[in-house]
Structures are given as C-alpha cells and as structure tokens.
Amino acid sequence: MMVEDLVYRYALMNAVKHKGKANPGAVMGAVMSNEPELRKRAPEVKEAVQAAVEKVNSLKPEEQQSEMERLGLEIRERKQKKRQGLRNLPDVKGEVVLRFAPNPSGPLHIGHARAAILNHEYARRYDGKLILRIEDTDPRRVDPEAYDMIPSDLEWLGVEWDETIIQSDRMEIYYEYTERLIERGGAYVCTCTPEAFREFKNEGKACHCRDLGVRENLQRWREMFEMPEGSAVVRVKTDLQHPNPAIRDWVSMRIVEAEHPRTGTRYRVYPMMNFSVAVDDHLLGVTHVLRGKDHLANSEKQEYLYRHLGWEPPVFIHYGRLKMDDIALSTSGAREGIVEGKYSGWDDPRLGTIRAIARRGIRSDAIRKLMVEIGVKIADSTMSWKKIYGLNRNILEEEARRYFFAADPVRFEIEGLPGPIRVERSLHPDKPELGNRILELNGDVYLPRGDLREGPLRLIDAVNVIYSDGELRYHSEGIEEARELQAAMIHWVPAESALKAVVVMPDASEIEGVIEGDASELEVDDVVQLERFGFARVDSSGERLVFYYAHK
C-alpha cells in the first residue's frame, strides 16, 4: 500500500468520525502514532495528508460512508461494545484467493500463526481458496526439514489449504517474466558495485546501466547465468526521486552460487522476494494479501512491478506489529542454540515454535482465538504467555482429567492409621461420565515436600494427620475435625500404587515426583490437571511418566 493510500484511509476515518470533515492535524497525528516507520518521512506524509484531507472533505457524507465500506474500514467508539470476530475484507469481487507464504528456514513459530490463521479464517468466511506457498528462493536460508515441518505445524493449527506451491519449482517462470520486464523497459541489468550504486541511489541519479537499450540488457541478462556472484543484478525501474531510497530501483534478481537443498546447482540466478511474490500473486490469482505494516515499502515496490507488466495488484491489507513479550521467536537464534546444545530441539519448551507450544499441551483453539481477537487492526498489539495461558485454561478446565501428583515427594508411614482407607474421586468434577479413580491408603503415603508444614494436615478426602518432627500421626477422619484443627489441605499419593513421574517445566528444568496409580491408563498427548500443581501434557508413558508443563 502506497503512502497516499494509507493516509487516505486515516483521513476518511477521521472525517466520518467528525461529521464529514477531516482535520489535517488529527490525521497527521494518527499516522505518526500508528505508523512509526513513516516518521522519518514526515514531510512527504504531511503533503499526502493535505491532499487526502482535501479529497475526503470534498465528498458528501454518504460518499464517505460508501468509501469506508468499500475499503473495509470501521470506526470503533470507545463506549461501544467491542466488535467480535474479524472485520470484512475490502473490495471483494468474485472468488477470494489468499496465501500463506512462509520462508522454509525452520518450523513455524507463534508469530507465523497470526498470518496462517487469519488467512484461513477469511478463506473459510468467503468460501475462498488458500494457497500454501513455500518461499525458498534464497538457498542459504533453507532448512530441508522445513518442507515437512511447515505443513505439519499448519495441520496442528487446524489450517486447511487448497494448494501447495514451492517457489524453487517455478524458476523458469521467474526467468520468463524477467525477460518480459526487460523487454517492456521496466528493468535493467546493473553491474555497478553495491557501493557505487548506493551513491547514485542516495543522490537520486541514474547509473550508466539504467540507460542501456533493451537488446543490450537482454544480452547482459543471458550472461548473468555465467557471471560470478555479486557481479550483476537485475533492477526494477522505479522513481529515482522517491522519498524512500529503499524503493529506488530495487533488486529483483541476483546471482547466488550456493547449492539449493532441492534443486542443487541447477540454478544460480534467483529472484528476490519482492519479485517472486508479485509474479506469483498475479499468476495464482491472489486477490487479497494480509501482511504486517512493516511490509508497506514492499507493497509499494511491488506496485511498480505490477504497473510495468500491466497487471492489477491485489488488495494489500496491512496490520500492526505483534509484540511478543517473554516469547523466544528468533529462528536463527533457536537453530544456533540447538547446534550448541542449549536447546534439545525445535520443540524445546523454552521456544515459541508451534511444536514446542503443542508439546506443552497448549491447544490450537487457544492460539486461533487469540489471533482472531487480535485481528487485522492497524495498531500494534502485544501478546504474552499470560494471555495464551488464560485462553488455554478455559479449554482445558472443561476436558482435563484430574490426578494427584506429589512433586519432590517425601514418603511417610502414617502412625496409628486404623485400617485401609479407600477414596473414590471423580476424574472431572463436572463430567461424571468420565468415571472415577480409586486411591487405596494402607499406611504409606507420598506427600509433596513443598507443601509440608508442622501441625495438622488434611489429606484431601481421606484423613487428618499431625506432622511433627518428620513424622505423620493419624488424628481423625472427618472433615469437621479438620476444620476444628484448621488443618492445611494437602494432596497425596498412596505409596503402594504410586508411579514415578517427571514434569518438564517451561524453562526446561525437571521436577521429579510420583503420581497416583490410575495414571497408568494415560496415553501420549493426553493433557491432564495435576491437582494444585498445574496442567500438563503426557509426553511419554510406561513405568516412568514424563509430562510437559503447560501452566497453572
């Protein structure tokens, strides 16, 4: 989206909010507040604001409202109830085609989930088409395992797609359209050094390569396939006076001599992202592109390409940044940590990858609900584990079976226990259909070390004991006696049937403990509530159960 288009939207919203008259100062303030990357282009933005305000204020109120609907904009009054769900897509004409286009540098992380889920939600809403496009045209940033990990992660997220496209299979297409672009005079082969071109670009001047004819540029293009890396690039002609130097004659093709994991050394001239993306979006019929507002400049670059080739661009929808507090998302940092042995793998609980989140028992529905709630608003949003845990807890509370788990357990023989005690507790307090579990207390019991304290204790649903000098002495059985004693409630595990268990925490530390014997029926991927400890997913079963901790 070009600056003029973005500013026009802000002016339109301001006008509708203030009886049809937009205020230049208010519009400028909104743009600078919500689009920090444009602050360094303030003079250009100010001119665009003035033009947009004049245009918007010349419209009748009903025309302004019509424009709002066309662009999919809405005004939220502070006192109004917050709108539920995603807003409608703007400019829907016929079939809606969207794409999710990750780089295969590793598995997906929770930041990718936003784009994947939002595209899927819109595809379902409009009964449209969703394309999974693997953008692997930088051989040095391709992890071969990612070709399998990405679809697997999407399946866990519940994202369904209609077609898979792998860009490295389409190299001949990119070559064809590079030639077309050169023939139309929209691109040229540049042999300037990066330093030399940077000087030309910063001064807003053309290098000598720009003025060469089509025939010579086509010859240079063919020669690029034999030239060494760094000796030549293809540049798309834009505006050399553009306020943003990054947009001036951007690179569309470059030479890369690295071996590609899928195609080997078959190709050595590769497209840059902005070129391959624009070509594919057009040829695949993509109608709407959802992307972060950090791609505003990329959208503007691609629009030059569309104009050169006589194509209609898709509708670009830019949303605000998603700030992720306390969540490790760097793919390169994670890979480095895995190689160094800091992390056990891509599903290490300290990471923010989809597979790490799934391993901890976070439900995909919780992630989907969060991303839909954040939506495509242009303002930045913040996400944290606390928010994810809250949504996930609402899901797990309804389905997780309950068990006693004693962390760092201490074994006791209860002195004076009059006889075996049989306790029957429901697997879920609100779902009797799940059945009960049986705890047989015959004298020996495990208690969690961290909950021990001198004085009266109530073994939940069982007996009252006195803990003193490292020993447990039976006192009584009734709950009324426990109240009179002001006994502290404590969960417990019968020693005779106890199973060894370990809980892997979010920081990858491990807590050893024991769990009640009925947990032997648990299977891998079951998520349970370890009462008074937290929710956890079964990672492995057998004589020693391994859980991955989710949250309280």
Curated annotation (Swiss-Prot):
It is an enzyme of class 6 (ligase). InterPro entries: aa-tRNA-synth_I_CS, Gln/Glu-tRNA_Ligase, Glu-tRNA-synth_arc/euk, Glu/Gln-tRNA-synth, Glu/Gln-tRNA-synth_Ib_cat-dom, Glu/Gln-tRNA-synth_Ib_codon-bd, Rbsml_bL25/Gln-tRNA_synth_N, Ribosomal_bL25/Gln-tRNA_synth. Transmembrane segments: none annotated. GO terms for biological process: amide biosynthetic process; glutamyl-tRNA aminoacylation. It is found in: Cytoplasm. Disulfide bonds: none annotated. It comes from the Archaea. It holds the Pfam family tRNA-synt_1c_C. A motif ('HIGH' region) lies at residues 102-112. Coiled coil: none annotated. One of its GO terms (cellular component) is cytosol. Belongs to the class-I aminoacyl-tRNA synthetase family. Glutamate--tRNA ligase type 2 subfamily. Catalyzes the attachment of glutamate to tRNA(Glu) in a two-step reaction: glutamate is first activated by ATP to form Glu-AMP and then transferred to the acceptor end of tRNA(Glu). This is Glutamate--tRNA ligase. It comes from Methanothermobacter marburgensis (strain ATCC BAA-927 / DSM 2133 / JCM 14651 / NBRC 100331 / OCM 82 / Marburg) (Methanobacterium thermoautotrophicum). The lineage of its organism: Archaea, Methanobacteriati, Methanobacteriota, Methanomada group, Methanobacteria.
